[in-house]
C-alpha cells in the first residue's frame, strides 16, 4: 500500500486512517506513515514538527509548542514522543528524534 501523508499548513488539519496533523495559526505540521505505522503531529507558535512512522507498531507523537523544527522517525515496534517541553523519547525498535524546541534528541539503533 502507498504511504499516507497528513500535511497541515497554518490553521489547517489533515486526517487519514493512520495519521493526523493539526496546525494552529502559526504552526506547520506533517505526519507520514507506511506499512502499519501511526503518526500524529500538532503545531503552533512557529513550531514545525514532522512525524514519520514506518512498519508494524511504529508510533510517533509530535507536539510543537515553541518556535523550531522537530523530527521523529520510528521503525517497526518503536515509539517516539516529542512534547516540546522535555527531551524526546525513543523506545522499542529503531528510532530517532531531534528537537530544536528543547535542543535535545534521542537515538535507538
Regions found by a protein language model. Name each.
Residues 32-34, 44, 52-54, 63, ...:
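Feature marks extracellular polysaccharide-active and adherence modules
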Residues 6-14, 29-34, 50-53:
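Short, solvent-exposed secondary-structure boundary motifs
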Residues 18, 26-28, 36-38, 48-50, ...:
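Detector for repetitive beta-architecture
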Residues 1-16, 59-109:
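Long terminal segments
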Amino acid at each position: 500500500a502507498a504511504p499516507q501523508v497528513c500535511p497541515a499548513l497554518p490553521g489547517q488539519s489533515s486526517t487519514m486512517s493512520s495519521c493526523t496533523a493539526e496546525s494552529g495559526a502559526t504552526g506547520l505540521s506533517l505526519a507520514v506513515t507506511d506499512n502499519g505505522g501511526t503518526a500524529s503531529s500538532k503545531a503552533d507558535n512557529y513550531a514545525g514538527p514532522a512525524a514519520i512512522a514506518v512498519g508494524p507498531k511504529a508510533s510517533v507523537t509530535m507536539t510543537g509548542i515553541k518556535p523550531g523544527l522537530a523530527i521523529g522517525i520510528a521503525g517497526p515496534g518503536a515509539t517516539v514522543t516529542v512534547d516540546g517541553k522535555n527531551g524526546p523519547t525513543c523506545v522499542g525498535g529503531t528510532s530517532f528524534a531531534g528537537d530544536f524546541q528543547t535542543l535535545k534528541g534521542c537515538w535507538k539503533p
